[in-house]
Amino acid sequence: MTRRETVDVGGVPISYLTAGKGGPLVLLLHGTYWSRVWQPVLDGIAASGLRPVAVDFSGFGRSGGELTVSEASVPRLSAWLVSFLEALGQKGPVMVAGHDIGGGVAQHLMLANRVEVARVAVVNGIMYDSWPVPGVARFRDPAVAAATTRDDVLAARRVSVVKALGRPASEAEIAEYLDPWTDPRVARSWLALAGAADHRYTMEMLPALLQSKTPKLLVWGEDDPFQTIDYAERYAREIPDTRLVRIKSAGHIPMENDPKAVAGALGKFFACKQ
């Protein structure tokens, strides 16, 4: 059963969703959304004998803290995860899945060698020069970000959430997704993440990715209007030890369109002994 827990990381209360009764740790990362994107698949992943942990980065979701632009880059978020894993008491290899910008953070964590990453999955995540999308890129202008209010962030995120779900959604469900950004602190953290969005980070990973032997899985909603499947197809062709699983009739958050298929693909991949 899915539950929310909290751990102290450097004096900041960090929230995460988890499920199951233990097993090998699978770290689940969000991007421009929050841990809520993983909720539909947590029980399914746990059913494979795994311990899923869907963390809210500092300043996001239900976590405390607030991100600055300098703290919100892919490399800095990757480095922060080392402290989070230490706070969890995690020792030994870890497995990671990332959605959206979290997909870039997952790849960076794998390549940085600060912790041993045994397997990596990217779910409709950033790669190559696929990002930032226009709805995020416009906030990279400091003047635009400075003039943006909490209500502006809420309005922009509403548009993105409705589009990303890729299916009809009730007002209650949309409100649940948007709720963290009603806090001005969390809205400012989102603006920091947008301000730090730069595809040079994923492009700089390419030489190391081309040499990487770590098993990798791409799980992709085929109808994603943000991170289009052609990027995933290219990645699967070019990057060693990569397999692509397509989720039909699914958008940017395929966990919401076909949770059984997504949880099944991730559970099988992360539970593999080889």
Which residues does each PLM region occupy?
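Conserved HGGG/HGGXW glycine-rich cap/lid loop of the alpha/beta-hydrolase fold
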Residues: 18-62
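Catalytic active-site module of serine/aspartate enzymes centered on a nucleophile-bearing elbow/loop
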Residues: 242-274
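Conserved alpha/beta-hydrolase catalytic His-Asp/Glu region
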Residues: 131-133, 151-210
